[in-house]
């Protein structure tokens, strides 16, 4: 059974709230070591986003690009990071949940559940 799912959750630690309406793109590193774009999605009101579902998610190296520049611009906040790339090795048949803790001048990520 394919248990593979890929999701994220973005929290803006500068205001203590979820980051809604942030565009996230997903790319897969292909056999010739080039990034192949798979999907673009957007976080919901709770800052959550299902990126890939079972059957859409082969093993491999993935790049998540969080397009946070527009999120901060809408709030009239300058940011050092207009986009954040997180590269993840998704080689196991598991659910990969990659949260992003964000503020205008820094970020942190980890593997969640």
Each model region followed by its residue ranges:
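Feature of secretome-associated and extracellular-like proteins
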Residues: 63-113
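A glycine-anchored, Pro-Gly-centered beta-turn/N-cap motif
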Residues: 57-62
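Beta-strand-rich domain onsets/edges
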Residues: 1-20, 28
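Short, acidic Ser/Thr/Gly-rich low-complexity loop/linker segments typical of extracellular
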Residues: 33-50
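Beta-strand signatures of extracellular beta-sandwich domains
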Residues: 23-27, 63-65
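Short hydrophobic alpha-helix segments
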Residues: 14, 22, 39-42, 53
């Amino acid at each position: 059974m394919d248990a593979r799912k890929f999701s994220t959750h973005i929290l803006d630690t500068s205001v203590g709230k979820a980051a809604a309406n942030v565009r996230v793109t997903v790319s897969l590193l292909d056999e010739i070591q080039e990034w192949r774009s798979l999907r673009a999605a957007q976080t919901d009101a709770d800052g959550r986003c299902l990126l890939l579902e079972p059957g859409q998610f082969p093993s491999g190296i993935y790049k998540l690009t969080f397009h946070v520049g527009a999120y901060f611009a809408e709030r009239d906040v300058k940011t050092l990071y207009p986009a954040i790339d997180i590269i993840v090795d998704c080689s196991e048949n598991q659910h990969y949940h990659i949260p992003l803790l964000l503020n205008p001048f820094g970020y942190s990520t980890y593997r969640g559940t």
